[in-house]
């Protein structure tokens, strides 16, 4: 009984520590999300490269431009229905594009003519915007196609492809349209039709872009990638730690059942384990008293 009490106390203490640790770890992804948003915000308002500009021989200025002025092309896609059977050319799904990312493994297939293929096939450096989506948070998001994985890769009609002039790096423009201020501006253009939320090519062209010189764009891209890689490393470490914490509860309970939580206590209290004060001795004493009590009752009945 004494050992059971010690086990219960240790379990309460250890499991409370596990819950507290888990709660702190679970807050970190949200903190990292805010960190990434702050990085994107600083990237497009000049704060991220503010000190860097002090060492530049020429004064760097962020120009306010309509997106249309740095476009060589903004093209809607084919409206033909894709298939799942693998016939034709690979085509992205609308879900392939998320803010700052294009998943080239999220594909279906589409049969089209040679001329349609030439007009709509993608290449490295293409920017893709989601034109329609059932979820507001995914409307107007921008992803950059990097390291093309499929030959003759196409995009569906709910995406819009953008190609840029030499004045703008596609990596910087992806960062810009993923920033909180640009996302808010894009949201102001969203309209709902038949349950689908969407924007038009005209809406995208009219977006105001803050554009520094190409050299500073490259520095912004480098710093954002560096800071995001740092955040990704932390997130991976946190996820690994959370997985271990989630296994701790079962591990602690298993140790409790095996008596490992109270090994030191048993070493310090041998009399409660095997002496006259132990649980085993107490049980034997109770059995003896019950036997004696039963014997007396039986003898009285015979007389």
Residues covered by each model-derived region:
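Short amphipathic coiled-coil heptad-repeat segments
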Residues: 6-54, 236-267
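Non-catalytic DNA-recognition/assembly elements of restriction-modification systems
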Residues: 1-8, 38, 55-76, 206, ...
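A short glycine-rich beta-alpha junction/loop motif
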Residues: 1-2, 150-160, 168-171, 186, ...
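Sequence-specific dsDNA recognition surfaces
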Residues: 68-81, 95-127, 144
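Short, flexible loop/hinge motifs at secondary-structure junctions
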Residues: 27, 33-36, 40-41, 47-59, ...
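Short, ligand-facing micro-motifs at secondary-structure edges
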Residues: 97-110, 130-155, 171-175, 184-190, ...
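Short, solvent-exposed loop/turn positions at domain surfaces
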Residues: 78, 116, 193, 236-239
